[in-house]
Amino acid sequence: MRGKKPHKELKLSVPAQETPVDKFLTASGTFKDGELRLNQRGLQLISEETADEPQSTNLKVEDVQLSMDDLEMIQVIGKGSGGIVQLVRHKWVGTLYALKGIQMNIQEAVRKQIVQELKINQATQNAHIVLCHQSFYHNGVIYLVLEYMDRGSLADIIKQVKTILEPYLAVLCKQVLEGLLYLHHERHVIHRDIKPSNLLVNRKGEVKITDFGVSAVLASSMGQRDTFVGTYNYMAPERISGSSYDYKSDIWSLGLVILECAIGRFPYIPSEGEGWLSFYELLEAIVDQPPPSAPADQFSPEFCAFISSCIQKDPAERMSASELLNHPFIKKFEDKDLDLRILVESLEPPMNISE
C-alpha cells in the first residue's frame, strides 16, 4: 500500500483570492450577502420574492439584542469552522455563552460557509442541536452567540475515559440520531462534519450537534450533493471518491464516531502499525478496504449489528436516522432509566468557571 496513489484523485484547488469586505457592507455598516443582512442590531433575512419590502425574522430567544458591550470575555475554548470560539459571560445577568467570532476579510468559499451557517442557525430549533441565541456584526467580525455546553465535546470525554460502555453509547447515540432526524427530514440539511469534537455535552447529560460551517441544505429529503468538504477521517466513501451523496453520509460518520467511543481508537488502523503515511493513504483505505466492524467477542450482537447498519460502503445499505432510532440496540436500553449525567459528573470538566 505504501507509495500508491489514491484510488481516485482528489480535485484540489488553490484558495480563492480574498474579497474586500467592503464589497459586502452597506453605508450603515451592515454586512449583506444575498438575502442576508447582519449588523449590531442582529440578523435579518429577506426573501427573494419580497426583496423590496424587507421583513425581519429576528430571533426570539433573547428579549434584547446583545452587543459586545454586554459580554465579558473569559477565555478561548476552541476553534470552529472559520473562527475562534470564546467563553463569555453576560455582564448583567451572568449567563455563560460560547461566542464564535468569524473574521470577514474573506475568501468567497469561506463567506458562503459563514452565510450558510448563519441561515441554518437562524432556522434551527431542536433539543439536540446547539442553540444559536443571536448573531451580530461588529468591527469586521460576525459573532454567533451560542449555547454554552459546559462539559465540552465527546472528544474531551474520550480523552478521559478512553472507552464508553454500551448502555451510555445507546443513550448518547439516541440523542444524536434525534438531532440528525430533525436536520435531515425537517430542515433538509446534511451536516457533513459529524465527529467527536462536534458533539457537545452539558452537565445535564444532554448531547447536541454543533458547527454548521460546512453543512449543505438540499431542496428536498431526496436530494444529493457532490462537493468535497468536512473532516476527512469520518468522511463516507462516496464523498471521498467524488460521487453524489445524501443524508446517509452523516450516518457513516456517526457509525465511525460511536465505534471509536467503544473501542478506544479510530476504527481504521494502518498496515504494519507504522501510522498513516499521509491523509491520502487513509482516504484510499476508507474507499478500498472493507468497512470496520465491532469485535463480536467484545460487544453485544445488537451493538455489532447497529455499527454494521451505519458503516456500509453502499449508502443504500445504510439505515436512516429514523430507522436507527428503532434499532434493537437503541431499544435495548430505553427502559433502563439510564442518565448520561452519571457519566459526565464523574469526569473533570474541560474548565472550571465560577458563574
From Swiss-Prot:
Nucleotide-binding in keyword set: yes
Keywords annotated in UniProt: ATP-binding, Kinase, Nucleotide-binding, Phosphoprotein, Serine/threonine-protein kinase, Transferase
EC class name: transferase
PTM sites of type Phosphoserine: 221
Gene Ontology BP annotations: defense response to oomycetes; lateral root formation; male meiosis cytokinesis
Inducing factors: By low temperature (12 degrees Celsius) treatment.
Catalytic reaction(s) noted: L-seryl-[protein] + ATP = O-phospho-L-seryl-[protein] + ADP + H(+); L-threonyl-[protein] + ATP = O-phospho-L-threonyl-[protein] + ADP + H(+); L-tyrosyl-[protein] + ATP = O-phospho-L-tyrosyl-[protein] + ADP + H(+)
Active-site residue list: 193 (proton acceptor)
Oligomer and partners: Interacts with MPK5/MAPK5.
Family: Belongs to the protein kinase superfamily. Ser/Thr protein kinase family.
Name by which UniProt lists this protein: Mitogen-activated protein kinase kinase 1
Species annotation: Oryza sativa subsp. japonica (Rice)
The encoding gene: MKK1
